[in-house]
Amino acid sequence: MLIENFRPGTLEGWGMSPQELHQLNPGLVMLRISGYGQTGPYRDLPGFGAIGEAMGGLRHLTGEPGRVPVRVGVSIGDTLAALHGTIGVLTALYHRKVNGGKGQVIDVALHEAVFNVMESLIPEYSAFGVVREAAGSALPGIAPSNAYPCQDGWVLVAGNGDSIFKRLMDTIGRPDLGAAPDLADNAGRVARVQELDAAIGAWSAQRTVQQVLDALGNARVPAGKVYTAKDIAEDPHYRARDMLLSQTTRDGFTVQVPGIVPKLSATPGTIRSSAPHLGDDTDAVLAEAGLSDEQIALLRSKGVIQ
């Protein structure tokens, strides 16, 4: 298989179009990731993950209402493109296996990978003319579900189920809200969401994160601490599930890295090596492809490889 993320037309200009490559290797699976895809009026425009997040609709929904659209916090556009590309490659490899060994091209556009996870954004607009807007830390149309301050951090509380809401209100000392007829369902709670958020926030602000989690846990109300990197690195649950692994880099440094997701029962996988420097694995890859030491040395002497 071949993976490339040049601007569309670059490989064609090098004489390496899919048609030319498939003549040499009909079974080739080729993943092409670009800003706007291999076709369409925007195909020749340059694009990065951030631009894909903007065009895909994500940036418009991220941040506080009426404020500047903000970044999610990680390079989610690039990650989503990679995940969609992986799904496409696995599908194409399976197709090749069961349908005579023929390869194909997977075309992933950054903005489409983002758009594909935007839930009901377009159906809402198509059916009702609703343009969804940024909602800050809250979950739009669901109440109460938000981040609330504590003395030493923040917690996320999802008290939006009808019975959960009543238990939440009892826990924070507001049974009057839990018993209010107009708050018995989500629609009524959404109408009074600011009042509910204020009540929960006033209660949580007088307690530590752990006190809040203990109280809500006893009441079977879904809640969780807003973790920092330090919190994750020291968390026993992460360690118990092998999500914090020690890895020695090729420079000799020992660092913690994320474990493997998803977890397969029969073939859980492992991290075999750290990330290479540029060219570290060239000889091994070429040898695996059948080149001799002499052929590899010749390529290096001609400057084809380093």
Give the ranges of each region predicted by the language model.
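Aromatic-enriched alpha-helical interface/lid elements that frame and gate functional surfaces
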Residues: 143-219, 223
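Active-site-adjacent "lid/gating" segments in soluble enzymes
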Residues: 12-155, 159-160
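A glycine-rich dinucleotide-binding beta-alpha-beta segment and adjacent secondary-structure elements
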Residues: 218-272
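Residue-level signal for nonpolar/aromatic packing positions in well-ordered secondary structure
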Residues: 3, 21, 30, 49, ...
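Rossmann-like NAD(P)-binding element
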Residues: 1-12
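Amphipathic terminal alpha-helices
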Residues: 234, 294-306
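Residue-level detector of anion-binding/catalytic polar loops
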Residues: 1-2, 27, 222
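Flexible, small-/acidic-enriched active-site or ligand-binding loops
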Residues: 184, 252-298
